[in-house]
A protein has these predicted regions:
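Solvent-exposed, non-transmembrane regions of integral membrane proteins
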Residues: 4-342
Length: 342
């Protein structure tokens, strides 16, 4: 997962840099380098997953010979591309000039934050291999490291994104461009304060996620509506470039994702316990009872299934049937969660 995330981050950088090249004819060398790195990290992710150098449930079809073949391809492609880039990068002269306060600068800041975060992800992924190879130590880098190292860059990115989206190209006045965002900023702060007041516990993660989500989504909406002018009509909406809609949906999706991650981290509840057959326990306003544990034979698997009755105020709501499956041919156990959406 982490190896593919690093490649995805470089692809996002490449997309933003390509926009600058298209609009302003600058950052040409940087864009070519990002294209090389994005492809290279895709190969690195393939090598990690296929070669078996890392032990993980996500590593499949392990084959050291295939891994060596991928490593050779990686060396040839990346070595050749970076060598050619080092000799020819000076020929890609940038024509566009921009000031320190402009949309170009905001996109460069976005690239820097994403580049550092991608390096952090790659470092955390590859460090157990380095530690075992050179220091003979077995290490495991888990979620605490990635959360602590990755989160600050994502918060900075979320703060910059609406401001950068509303800046004009080439040259901008930060005060004039930010005036229209003041109301959005205040409203986002108020929403975060409301969540802080009504939440159980005093975790900052949830309110910060609400603030960033509201700030990004509403700031992106403001950028879209500002292109429509004062008279918002269906006709003007239809003639807007598709790139504006693409930016709106992509940035709004990022804001919603930040909120969802923060909400899950802050407000999820996990209850691990041993329950005998016929035993019951309570979670919030719900009462759960383990009615039975059954052995089930499927078309290509054997399963141990729990039958759990869920009730509220003495009334049965639903029956959940989570399973622990084992596939004899693949020798692969899986967990099938039981989810009720009401």
């Amino acid at each position: 997962q982490q190896s593919s995330a690093a490649s995805d981050v470089y692809k996002r950088q490449l997309l933003h840099s390509a926009i600058v090249v298209e609009k302003r004819e600058t950052l040409k060398s940087w864009t070519i380098l990002l294209a090389i790195l994005a492809f290279g990290f895709s190969l690195i992710g393939t090598f990690i997953v296929r070669s078996g150098v890392l032990t993980s449930v996500h590593a499949f079809a392990n084959d050291p010979e295939r891994g060596m073949f991928i490593l050779i391809i990686l060396g040839i492609f990346m070595g050749g591309a970076l060598t050619l880039f080092s000799f020819r990068s000076s020929a890609m002269e940038a024509r566009g000039v921009f000031s320190m306060v402009s949309r170009e600068t905001a996109l460069v800041s976005n690239n820097v934050l994403l580049a550092v975060s991608a390096f952090v992800v790659f470092f955390g992924t590859i460090w157990p291999l380095v530690a075992e190879l050179f220091f003979d130590r077995k290490l495991s880098v888990g979620p605490p490291f990635f959360n602590a190292a990755f989160t600050p860059f994502m918060i900075l990115l979320g703060l910059i994104l609406p401001v950068g989206s509303n800046l004009p190209w080439k040259r901008a006045n930060i005060l004039n461009s930010s005036k229209k965002l003041i109301f959005v900023f205040i409203l986002s702060i108020c929403l975060a304060g409301l969540i802080w007041a009504i939440q159980t516990g005093k975790s900052l993660i949830g309110p910060v996620g609400v603030f960033l989500g509201a700030w990004i989504v509403m700031g992106t909406m403001l950028d879209l509506f500002s292109k429509l002018g004062r008279s918002i009509s269906l006709k003007r909406l239809i003639v807007l470039p598709r790139a504006d809609f693409g930016k709106f949906f992509a940035h709004s999706g990022l804001g919603i994702t930040m909120f969802a991650i923060a909400a899950l981290t802050s407000w999820e509840k996990e209850d691990i316990r041993v329950v005998p057959v016929g035993g019951s326990w309570k979670i919030a306003a719900y009462e759960l009872k383990l009615n039975s544990v059954e052995n089930v034979r499927g078309p290509n698997y054997f399963s141990t299934m729990g039958v759990i009755a869920v009730s509220k105020d003495g009334q049965l709501l639903t029956v959940l049937r989570p399973e622990k499956r084992n596939y004899p041919v693949a020798q692969m156990p899986t967990t099938e969660a039981a989810i009720d959406y009401r």
